């Protein structure tokens, strides 16, 4: 049995061991491509894969657990082990990761608890999740013949809190459930975060996260170790080789040669985990959101990250630059030729059916009635859209409407006619409507949850609760008697295309095409407005013509030999009679500074 130890260095069976790791999140890459990505990691000369674990995927509703198909973490670990790769697993409840709500399930927002704290209610919820998760991970520990070297207790907690009782509680939950491998924390490498977010006083291993200036950052970590009498190896648990992207902002890139030199600096002093090695995709509604002041800044669907592998998993110029550096400076780590996947293109896929959301609403959702508007989470919904509907009489020729405390984006319609779209800070501003006095009208408000904040000071903000939190005013009073239509859009097969379509309304558009040999491709959405797309029922994620991304990645495994269908839900009234599949992503140039 192989033994892994952390002393003055990392040791495998008593021999000094340098961890050469790359991050591949199993939940961002289809299972059919796990081997491809893991093989390319091994081909680089690396020996370990690292992955987070996304709680909100494994327990989407309280007490409902999923570990099958794309969530089969055990299969991912076994695939890595079959290739001779070790694993670092980060099952901490919070993962950040530019992932919806930092990986926490949204149903926690309906509970009376303080998240990421020693609050007993929160610890109890984590414990129930760990009962399911850790029973599946423990057999894969190195001690039990698997490939897991070590596991994380919490993620960058020093950038959030200093509740050491919480960190100790998570550690205890893990150890009580059979975790025997070394445990660690990862934080920014400066004193304040290390002091707040680690358990160095309890002899829990400490790692740092950074993306450059390795000598300086490691020196800060070494200083912290020395203060506490620790003779530990240095490891960068997240070496940021690229960066994520947000709507309306430029694509962030990094020079391959500069990156290779920066990686060399890390390896001259310690061990590394490249974050990301393969970024993959935020399929569905799982993109995260940054916070800047009072603003939320949702991230795009692509998690390409300008990583060593591109979104579909093929080596990039960065991969080749790091591979060359490794061969030159660290020739003791054998390399292989990497694998490449083919892509495909397809022009002029015709529109075959279309239907307005308001027409097919009842086939997609059952209304929930209440006196005042309810939040998304109160309705048992976590992601997607929520339609609020009521009826009202107009008391003046020009009425004033206001949405009070709404998030994130609201589109208001009167009798099916678009009136106003408001986004974040605009919500709450007056909306003026010219109506026929005394006439009874239907008021519809379509609200989109564009992704919850995954990091920072707004993690506990009330804006994490989506939909309309207070109410809707006409003149100075709140309107009553609302119907709520939850639209998580997890049932596109129920769209009734036999119903009508009205120009300018949110609508579904269906496009049929045939494929002889499925290959990776991208759906060009540059002439559409905003929405989400599906292929054969799989949610590809969001699109928005503000950029910087104007396409959605379609993995080959989402396509079928023969007949295929793409359905586009578009909310702005912008669509095309034909769509196109391309070999490469479609991007929008936005002026700005790169990383």
Q: What are the functions of these language-model segments?
A:
Residues 63-69, 93-117, 167, 171, ...:
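Aromatic- and acidic-residue-enriched segments that line the glycan-binding/catalytic groove
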Residues 176-177, 209, 213-317, 325:
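Catalytic-core region of carbohydrate-active enzymes that cleave or remodel glycosidic bonds
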Residues 72-89, 112-148:
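An active-site-proximal structural segment forming one wall of the substrate-binding cleft
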Residues 398-414, 443, 513-536, 543-544, ...:
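Aromatic-lined ligand-binding clefts that engage carbohydrates, nucleic acids, or primary amines
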Residues 19-31, 55-73, 109-128, 152-163, ...:
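The substrate-binding groove and active-site-proximal loops of carbohydrate-active enzymes
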Residues 1-48, 78:
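N-terminal carbohydrate-binding accessory modules
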Residues 122-201:
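Active-site neighborhood of glycoside hydrolase catalytic domains
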Residues 34-100, 171-176:
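Aromatic-lined substrate-binding rim segments of carbohydrate-active enzymes
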């Amino acid at each position: 049995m192989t033994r892994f130890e952390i002393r003055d260095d990392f040791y495998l069976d008593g021999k000094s061991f340098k961890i050469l790791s790359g991050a591949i999140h199993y939940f961002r890459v289809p299972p059919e491509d796990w081997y491809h990505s893991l093989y390319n990691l091994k081909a680089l000369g690396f020996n370990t894969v690292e992955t987070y674990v996304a709680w909100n995927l494994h327990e989407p509703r309280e007490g409902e657990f999923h570990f099958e198909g794309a969530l089969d973490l055990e299969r991912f670990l076994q695939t890595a082990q079959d290739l001779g790769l070790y694993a670092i697993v980060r099952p901490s409840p919070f993962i950040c990761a530019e992932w919806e709500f930092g990986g926490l399930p949204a149903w926690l927002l309906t509970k009376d608890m303080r998240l990421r704290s020693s609050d007993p209610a929160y610890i109890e919820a984590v414990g129930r999740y760990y009962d399911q998760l850790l029973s599946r991970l423990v057999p894969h520990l190195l001690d039990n013949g698997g490939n897991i070297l070590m596991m994380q207790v919490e993620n960058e907690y020093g950038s959030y809190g200093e509740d050491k009782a919480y960190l100790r509680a998570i550690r205890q939950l893990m150890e009580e459930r059979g975790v025997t491998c070394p445990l660690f924390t990862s934080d920014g490498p400066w004193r304040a975060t290390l002091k707040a977010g680690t358990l160095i006083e309890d002899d829990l291993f400490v790692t740092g996260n950074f993306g450059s200036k390795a000598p300086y950052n490691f020196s800060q970590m070494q200083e912290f170790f020395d203060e506490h009498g620790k003779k530990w190896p240095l490891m960068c648990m997240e070496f940021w080789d690229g960066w994520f992207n947000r709507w309306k902002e430029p694509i962030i890139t990094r020079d391959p040669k500069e990156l290779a030199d920066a990686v060399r600096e890390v390896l001259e002093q310690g061990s590394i985990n490249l974050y990301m090695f393969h970024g993959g995709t935020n399929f569905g509604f799982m993109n995260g959101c940054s916070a800047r002041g009072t603003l939320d800044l949702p991230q795009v669907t692509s998690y390409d990250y300008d990583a060593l592998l591109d979104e579909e998993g093929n080596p990039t110029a960065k991969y080749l630059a790091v591979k060359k550096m490794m061969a030159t400076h660290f020739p003791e780590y054998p390399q292989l030729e990497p694998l490449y996947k083919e892509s495909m293109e397809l022009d002029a896929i015709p529109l075959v059916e279309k239907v307005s959301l308001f027409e097919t609403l009842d086939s997609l959702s059952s209304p929930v009635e209440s006196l005042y508007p309810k939040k998304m989470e109160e309705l048992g919904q976590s992601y997607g859209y929520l339609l609020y509907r009521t009826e009202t009489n107009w008391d003046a020729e020009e009425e004033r409407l206001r949405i009070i405390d709404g998030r994130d984006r609201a589109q208001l319609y009167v009798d099916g006619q678009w009136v106003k779209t408001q986004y974040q800070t605009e919500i709450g501003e007056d909306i003026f409507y010219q109506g026929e006095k005394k006439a009874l009208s239907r008021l519809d408000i379509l609200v989109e949850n564009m992704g919850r904040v995954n990091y920072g000071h707004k993690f506990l903000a009330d804006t994490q609760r989506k939909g309309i939190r207070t109410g809707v005013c006409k003149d100075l009073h709140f309107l009553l008697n609302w119907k709520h239509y939850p639209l998580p859009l997890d049932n596109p097969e129920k769209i009734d295309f036999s119903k009508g379509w009205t120009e300018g309304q949110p609508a579904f558009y269906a496009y049929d095409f045939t494929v002889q040999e499925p290959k990776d491709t991208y759906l060009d959405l540059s002439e559409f407005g905003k929405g989400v797309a599906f292929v054969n029922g799989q949610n590809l994620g969001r699109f928005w013509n503000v950029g910087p991304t104007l396409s959605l990645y379609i993995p080959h495994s989402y396509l079928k030999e023969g007949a295929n269908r793409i359905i586009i839900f578009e909310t702005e009234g912008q669509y095309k009679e034909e769509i196109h599949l391309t070999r490469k992503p479609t991007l929008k140039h936005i002026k700005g500074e790169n990383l």
